[in-house]
């Protein structure tokens, strides 16, 4: 699934597995939208799109407007067709990818798991993997966005 964040004309695309990662995606949306000192604004899908070609067309249009992609990673993330498509399109667009591991109880990742996941990420324009819980994502997601922007 997807969501976008705009920063003074600079947008960020959020790629995630809807069933597994939607809660954290909503948390990021709420954190960003409620922070009055932040320049970020979350843009959300306005209409539910169900057919594959329409989803891909929407993804293509949205990613063309962005410079950054937040990739929320849970156990099943890389098994999802649209997540892979969004990563590919983000790379083709030259986006910086900010991977965030959703390290909750349902997603107990070992260091070996994380190393394997790292190998699935692009080698260029990809920031280090952050952990949503261990790295206090709720408190730090805005800083991670600023860091990626170079602020």
Residue ranges and their predicted role:
Residues 68-71:
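Inter-motif core of Ras-like GTPase G domains
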Residues 17, 74, 102:
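Cofactor-binding loop segments of dinucleotide-utilizing enzymes, especially the Rossmann-like FAD-
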Residues 97-101:
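Conserved beta-strand/loop subsegment of P-loop NTPase cores
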Residues 105-122:
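Glycine-rich, charge-decorated loop segments at or immediately adjacent to ligand/cofactor-binding or catalytic sites
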Residues 1-65, 141-151:
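Conserved N-terminal substructure of TIR/SEFIR domains
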Residues 123-151:
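C-terminal helix of von Willebrand factor
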Residues 76-95, 107:
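Conserved TIR/SEFIR loop-to-helix hotspot centered on a Trp-containing motif
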Residues 21-24, 79-81, 105-110:
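Short catalytic/ligand-binding loop motif for oxyanion handling, primarily in non-cytosolic enzymes
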């Amino acid at each position: 699934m997807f969501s976008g964040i705009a920063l003074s004309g600079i947008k960020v695309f959020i790629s995630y597995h809807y069933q597994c990662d939607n809660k954290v995606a909503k948390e990021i949306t709420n954190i960003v939208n409620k922070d009055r000192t932040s320049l970020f604004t979350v843009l959300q899908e306005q209409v539910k799109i169900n057919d594959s070609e329409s989803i891909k067309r929407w993804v293509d249009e949205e990613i063309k407007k962005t410079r950054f992609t937040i990739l929320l990673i849970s156990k099943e993330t890389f098994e999802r067709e649209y997540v892979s498509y969004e990563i590919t399109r983000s790379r083709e667009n030259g986006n910086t990818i900010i991977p965030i591991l959703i390290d909750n109880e349902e997603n107990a990742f070992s260091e070996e798991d994380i190393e394997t996941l790292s190998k699935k990420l692009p080698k260029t324009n990809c920031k280090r993997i952050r952990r949503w819980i261990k790295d206090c994502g709720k408190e730090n997601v805005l800083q991670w966005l600023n860091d990626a922007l170079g602020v």
